[in-house]
A protein has these predicted regions:
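Structured loop/turn residues at beta-strand edges in well-structured enzyme cores
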Residues: 42
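Nucleotide-activated donor-binding/catalytic signature segment of Leloir-type glycosyltransferases, i.e.
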Residues: 1-39, 93
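Catalytic binding pocket for nucleotide-activated donors in carbohydrate/polymer assembly enzymes
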Residues: 46, 50-128, 132-136
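C-terminal alpha-helical cap of glycosyltransferases
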Residues: 139-173
Length: 173
């Protein structure tokens, strides 16, 4: 996007929306907020995580779990998963690839514009939709996949141990 520290210094920035650049780990001990990430998160109206690559992407999920609608991309595993869910309004997933930087920027701006114009009832509906999507990502639903992956890994490791001479560089990774 743009150099975040300089975004709000632009002369054309006279609207109500402000970007805050915080170069700290939000553990409650920073000199700017003195609050944890989660305490700050619950006060937000919407979050934006325009990931270029994240295998899963916990930050958009955390936002949703705290009833904060979020904007993410198709290059985050969570975004890809959330796009397949039925709930609408709590998560905006923007298709992102190597060549659509301008389009991604415009779509994020459009989504923020739409969120900023929601009335109280629509905002509450978006918050509930975000929370509903987060509940679907609970470990009680995903743990079976973890166990399945773990079982596959153990089976492959056992096969390598039984046949060490057949182990190649390719299947040891």
């Amino acid at each position: 996007f743009v150099m975040i520290p300089y975004l709000d210094r632009a002369p054309s920035r006279k609207g109500k929306v402000r970007t805050v650049f915080v170069p700290y780990y939000l553990d409650g001990h920073d000199p700017l907020f003195g609050m944890s990430y989660y305490d700050l998160l619950i006060g937000m109206d919407v979050t934006v995580f325009p990931s270029y690559y994240e295998p899963w992407g916990y930050t958009p999920l955390e936002s949703c779990a705290f009833h904060v609608p979020t904007i993410t991309t198709s290059l985050a595993g969570y975004g890809e998963w959330a796009a397949r869910q039925k709930e609408q309004g709590g998560v905006v997933v923007i298709d992102r690839n190597d060549s659509n930087f301008g389009e991604v920027t415009e779509r994020i701006a459009d989504a923020l514009f739409r969120f900023s114009h929601l009335n109280a009832e629509e905002t509450e509906k978006a918050r509930k939709a975000a929370a509903a999507v987060a509940k679907k990502a609970d470990w009680k639903h995903f743990f079976k996949y973890y166990r399945e992956a773990y079982s596959i890994a153990l089976t492959k490791a056992a096969a390598r141990n039984l046949n060490p001479q057949k182990t190649t560089k390719r299947n040891t990774k």
